[in-house]
Amino acid sequence: MGIADFLFGKKKVPGFSSAVYSIDVVMHPFRIAAHKADYAQLDIVVENKFDKELLTSIVITLPKSLGFEQSALSHQKEIRVGGLGPKDKKSIRVQVWGTARTDPGSYEIKLFAMSHYRDYSYVLNEVKKTVELRVA
């Protein structure tokens, strides 16, 4: 504990590690066609690795040329899972769409699994995973 932590009251929470969740992602197909209305389906499985039930939400962030619907207007999606017990898994399916303005290349999709306390406005911990979608 440093002097700044002592002055400002930052304390380490005992027994709470940073690897609270395990995120597995399967993408079908691995790539989508460029300059066409085409989509890939993400199958996301989140597992609670902690020994207590956690209030859980998942946030998915896409680049500007991809979206969650055919018009690709929304680029971020929050899915409120609810209470996820110890060693429980939750499976979610999401479609990621490319449009006529999607150029060929590799695009990063960011996934965040967050644990909350009280309600969804307070974040206790988060785990991030990045996957790549190829556009050809």
Segments (PLM) and residue ranges:
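Intrinsically disordered, low-complexity Pro/Gly/Ser/Thr-rich segments with frequent PxxP/GP/PP motifs
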Residues: 74-100
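Low-complexity, acidic Ser/Thr/Pro/Gly-rich terminal tails and inter-domain linkers that flank the onset
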Residues: 3-33, 136
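Short beta-strand and strand-turn-strand segments in soluble, beta-rich domains
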Residues: 22-24, 65-80
